[in-house]
Amino acid sequence: MKTTTSTISNLINNSLLRCAFIIMPFVLMCVATLPGARAVSPPPDGGYPGGNTAEGTDALLSLSSGTNNTAIGADALANNVSGNDNTAVGFQALLLATGNHNTAVGSEALFFDTGGHDNTATGFQALLNNTTGIENVASGAFALINNQTGDFNTATGTGALQANIGGDANTATGTAALSDNTSGINNTANGVNALFLILLATTTPPTG
């Protein structure tokens, strides 16, 4: 009797195992086809063709042929169509940008940049109004905020060179350093409020 019972038990167990092996693939297939289990398109990492990466509402919204751009934040690089090698991190950073090789980190940094290239802006509204200026570096909130066409400027500190519009090759280090300079060139100011009241200064020697 024991042998018969054991044999029956073995047969039942083997049958259950075989059923499990047959049913399991179907179960997995059903789970995989559930809406929540499907892959997200685009993928969560925001990778797109051409080496572009976008994360955030309308980030890189207008992109067509540009390559190697990174946009993180709502509206970051939203207007970029064909610009290459730009990096925007922050709300509306590089929003209107169409140029190349620009880096903006901070809300509205390089917001109006349309033709400038090789600019670096770090901080809230740094280089906000830059349109065609090139190779500028702004680090700090409002640094070079009003620069439009000036080139080769370096501003480090909150409000440094904030009034500069078309001046070139200026260096300001410190809060509000050279903050009233609008079109002067080749100035260097180090320290808080350094050269605060300068309006126009050049390296051109006086004549006469």
Where are these regions (language model features)?
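Glycine- and small/polar-enriched repetitive beta-structure motifs of secreted/surface proteins
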Residues: M1-G208
